[in-house]
Amino acid sequence: MPGTSVSDLPTTATAVDAPALLPLPVGRPQAPALVRGKLYIKTHGCQMNEYDSAKMADVLAASEGLELTDNPEDADVVLVNTCSIREKAQEKVFSQLGRWKALKAGGKPVIIGVGGCVASQEGEAIVKRAPYVDLVFGPQTLHRLPELIRARRESGKSQVDISFPEIEKFDRLPEPRADGPSAFVSIMEGCSKYCSFCVVPYTRGEEVSRPFEDVLVEVAQLAAQGVREINLLGQNVNAYRGAYGADAGEPAQYADLGLLIRTIAQIDGIGRIRFTTSHPLEFSDSLVDAYRDVPQLANYLHLPVQAGSDRILSAMKRGYTALEFKSKIRKLRAVRPDISISSDFIVGFPGETDADFDKTMKLIEDVGFDQSFSFIYSRRPGTPASDLEDDTPDAVKQARLARLQAHINAHAAGISQRMVGSVQRVLVEGPSRRDANELTGKTENMRPVNFPGNPRLVGQFVDVLITEALSNSLRGRIQLDDSAA
């Protein structure tokens, strides 16, 4: 985007003054016109992994001329981007690798690589157990894939790089390429909270925020390509502290997530902003103020609470009480009364009693969560919680999980039903998967909506009258204003 600048972006006054922004950089490597091979990527886990996989594809398209394929048998490079959150993640990875071993039959020079959090945990052990694996790389070293591939081909030896080079990953990625009207932008990596059950600090490292201006540049580049919705990503996204100002000879200042959202909202073309995943400890008044002041900030929040018992929250090392969590929700609903709130829950944490679980259900009732990601506790090696005694029968854990999910699902169904007859602002994402003659998009509270419409509307916001609530989606029709009637 030569000549494009974000230096004149207006900013809203906050506790931190926004910096003077520089022109957008040009000249980062782009995909060559010549396709020189095929790439297959299997992705497990969170939205951050989805983002990382997209960046792997961009890096290898730009440097190696690799084009994505849906069939690993057609690929010259096959990668699995792993997740270590759930139990037996390692075994699932080795099972996948065992199936891929046959791809090398007959001497075909296929490169097999393992990335993501399991790669960070296991490192050299992956190659020792599966010597046909060519590459092992962590979330922070995916940008080094071209060098790792070349080193593997030149040396004939497997390459392992699971280091934590902090922000270097973002400095060396190609310019972003839009793939539809909604895009993810990673604004930070890692987590420094060290919850007792979680492996993320050990697999992705401590919290490191991208510089404020770098994030704005990426968003502006995506907006110029037609992106209308930005999803800001981080393991603890609301801990964001993006540096700015040091280049002018002044001490660096730091923008929080609230200021970042305010500034992104003033980039031409950006009509909706989301962020995930948050930690309640970092849910600040600045962020509440952003919900009050920034209409582009979606009327939706995902804020993982994990449990409603203070005793269990303390054992999890979450750093807050159930009352403190509810206080933050009350502040938010004072400025956005109808906001939809989703959360994460861990059921059956070591030592959880019936009374503890009842407190979780009470919290769910008090807050009125719209959606949830809920799981039975999974012991992760190397975490403090893995040493705790766990004497709750599996059947009890299963029953608790079913009860929790049934309650939240019933509440969510009620919200969907009450949306019938309302008009919702929807970003048209593309044709419906169920009916190619219809369009699909999402409401602000993350509900898929299918409706008849002209394909030329893809990438635009439209008002949709909701006519029916189904189990996992809504149906509607485009609401025309009087001038279009």
UniProtKB/Swiss-Prot annotation:
<comment type="subunit">
    <text>Monomer.</text>
</comment>
<dbReference type="InterPro" id="IPR006638">
    <property type="entry name" value="Elp3/MiaA/NifB-like_rSAM"/>
</dbReference>
<dbReference type="Pfam" id="PF04055">
    <property type="entry name" value="Radical_SAM"/>
</dbReference>
<feature type="binding site">
    <location>
        <position position="198"/>
    </location>
    <ligand>
        <name>[4Fe-4S] cluster 2</name>
    </ligand>
</feature>
<keyword id="KW-0949">S-adenosyl-L-methionine</keyword>
<keyword id="KW-0963">Cytoplasm</keyword>
<feature type="domain" description="Radical SAM core">
    <location>
        <begin position="177"/>
        <end position="416"/>
    </location>
</feature>
<dbReference type="InterPro" id="IPR002792">
    <property type="entry name" value="TRAM_dom"/>
</dbReference>
<feature type="binding site">
    <location>
        <position position="83"/>
    </location>
    <ligand>
        <name>[4Fe-4S] cluster 1</name>
    </ligand>
</feature>
<dbReference type="InterPro" id="IPR006463">
    <property type="entry name" value="MiaB_methiolase"/>
</dbReference>
<feature type="domain" description="MTTase N-terminal">
    <location>
        <begin position="37"/>
        <end position="154"/>
    </location>
</feature>
<dbReference type="GO" id="GO:0005829">
    <property type="term" value="C:cytosol"/>
</dbReference>
<dbReference type="Pfam" id="PF01938">
    <property type="entry name" value="TRAM"/>
</dbReference>
<comment type="function">
    <text>Catalyzes the methylthiolation of N6-(dimethylallyl)adenosine (i(6)A), leading to the formation of 2-methylthio-N6-(dimethylallyl)adenosine (ms(2)i(6)A) at position 37 in tRNAs that read codons beginning with uridine.</text>
</comment>
<keyword id="KW-0819">tRNA processing</keyword>
<feature type="domain" description="TRAM">
    <location>
        <begin position="417"/>
        <end position="480"/>
    </location>
</feature>
<dbReference type="InterPro" id="IPR013848">
    <property type="entry name" value="Methylthiotransferase_N"/>
</dbReference>
<keyword id="KW-0479">Metal-binding</keyword>
<feature type="binding site">
    <location>
        <position position="195"/>
    </location>
    <ligand>
        <name>[4Fe-4S] cluster 2</name>
    </ligand>
</feature>
<feature type="binding site">
    <location>
        <position position="46"/>
    </location>
    <ligand>
        <name>[4Fe-4S] cluster 1</name>
    </ligand>
</feature>
<keyword id="KW-0808">Transferase</keyword>
<feature type="binding site">
    <location>
        <position position="191"/>
    </location>
    <ligand>
        <name>[4Fe-4S] cluster 2</name>
    </ligand>
</feature>
<dbReference type="Pfam" id="PF00919">
    <property type="entry name" value="UPF0004"/>
</dbReference>
<protein>
    <recommendedName>
        <fullName>tRNA-2-methylthio-N(6)-dimethylallyladenosine synthase</fullName>
        <ecNumber>2.8.4.3</ecNumber>
    </recommendedName>
</protein>
<dbReference type="GO" id="GO:0035600">
    <property type="term" value="P:tRNA methylthiolation"/>
</dbReference>
<keyword id="KW-0411">Iron-sulfur</keyword>
<dbReference type="InterPro" id="IPR038135">
    <property type="entry name" value="Methylthiotransferase_N_sf"/>
</dbReference>
<dbReference type="InterPro" id="IPR005839">
    <property type="entry name" value="Methylthiotransferase"/>
</dbReference>
<dbReference type="InterPro" id="IPR007197">
    <property type="entry name" value="rSAM"/>
</dbReference>
<comment type="similarity">
    <text>Belongs to the methylthiotransferase family. MiaB subfamily.</text>
</comment>
<feature type="binding site">
    <location>
        <position position="117"/>
    </location>
    <ligand>
        <name>[4Fe-4S] cluster 1</name>
    </ligand>
</feature>
<keyword id="KW-0408">Iron</keyword>
<dbReference type="GO" id="GO:0046872">
    <property type="term" value="F:metal ion binding"/>
</dbReference>
<dbReference type="InterPro" id="IPR023404">
    <property type="entry name" value="rSAM_horseshoe"/>
</dbReference>
<dbReference type="GO" id="GO:0051539">
    <property type="term" value="F:4 iron, 4 sulfur cluster binding"/>
</dbReference>
<keyword id="KW-0004">4Fe-4S</keyword>
<dbReference type="GO" id="GO:0035597">
    <property type="term" value="F:N6-isopentenyladenosine methylthiotransferase activity"/>
</dbReference>
<dbReference type="InterPro" id="IPR020612">
    <property type="entry name" value="Methylthiotransferase_CS"/>
</dbReference>
